[in-house]
Amino acid sequence: MIFSTLEHILTHISFSVVSIVITIHLITLLADEFVELYDSSEKGMITTFFCITGLLVTRWIFLGHLPLSDLYESLIFLSWSFSIIHMVPYFKKHKNFLSAITAPSTFFTQGFATSGLLTDMHQSEILVPALQSQWLMMHVSMMILGYAALLCGSLFSVAFLVITFRKIIRIFDKSNNLLNNSFFFSEIQYMAERKNVLRNISFLSSRNYYRFQLIQQLDDWGYRIISIGFIFLTIGILSGAVWANEAWGSYWNWDPKETWAFITWTIFAIYFHIRTNKKLEGFHSAIVASIGFLLIWICYFGVNLLGIGLHSYGSFTLTISI
């Protein structure tokens, strides 16, 4: 009873705090001068992190195993992973470009986890025999951390595409009364090969320069985070294969979850291969990462919605009451 009450309190505190953080972010977008509000939002995410950590630890103590056995618990762990990614730039004293991605991601995953759809999963249950293995912590935690990092990195790529797909960007200063012109991403790629081109061309507006800088930062941050996520995903798949061999006598069974995990891994492997070519990095790799974003959600939710295959533990069915 005490554990259930504590879990209930921590769940709602974490969701309430991250909701306030989102509101603060929206205010700071409208008015940049509210520096104190920005600091408050960062502290709010730290509070959210500790609340979710407390929730996971409470459930871990009560159940006797790491809470990663169903969709509800994995969503909580996913929210926790997003909050960790959010805090990395903060503690390194860097400007937190991740906050626009990680805070909403934490909000939506935490909101879905606490929604009425997963009410039946909130109750603590004994772990099914197939999941009673030391590989549970290794495999599932690596997969969820990989999903979190890949989702964040892919969202940076989506933002990259949104900015670069703007039809017209004026590159001449209006004060010079010169002919207005525009450039598309092929020109951005050309400039990307020469990092200081925008600095050396005096008639380019500062607005276009900072847009270019933002594009470069989105591409760089996306690449870094996807690299980390890809490592976690690879470790998760390999540890899952070892676990499968111990449990079912085969490293790979082409289970729906395994198949989509392999497809997701392949897409991001293609992403890294594309980035080895300087002429293709940026725009083309961002398209591949955006496809990977969709595949991750298919891999993560697909089996849980269908409730089939060897990975259908903790799946849920949507019930409609009339």
Swiss-Prot record:
Q: How does it assemble?
A: May interact with Ccs1.
List localization entries.
Plastid, Chloroplast thylakoid membrane
Please name the GO terms that the record assigns under molecular function: heme binding
Q: Which GO terms describe its cellular component?
A: chloroplast thylakoid membrane
- Tell me the lineage of the source organism: Eukaryota, Viridiplantae, Streptophyta, Embryophyta, Tracheophyta
Membrane topology label: Multi-pass membrane protein
Keyword Oxidoreductase assigned: no
Q: Does the keyword Thylakoid apply?
A: yes
Tell me the gene name.
ccsA
Known function: Required during biogenesis of c-type cytochromes (cytochrome c6 and cytochrome f) at the step of heme attachment.
Q: Which organism is it from?
A: Manihot esculenta
- Quote the protein name from its UniProt record: Cytochrome c biogenesis protein CcsA
What the entry lists under HAMAP family is as follows: CytC_CcsA
**BP-aspect Gene Ontology terms:** cytochrome complex assembly
Q: Which domain of life is it from?
A: Eukaryota
What family does this chain come from, according to its entry?
A: Belongs to the CcmF/CycK/Ccl1/NrfE/CcsA family.
Q: Which keywords appear in this protein's UniProt record, sorted alphabetically?
A: Chloroplast, Cytochrome c-type biogenesis, Membrane, Plastid, Thylakoid, Transmembrane, Transmembrane helix
Q: Which residues cross the membrane?
A: 9-29, 44-64, 71-91, 97-117, 143-163, 225-245, 254-274, 286-306
* A Pfam family hit: Cytochrom_C_asm
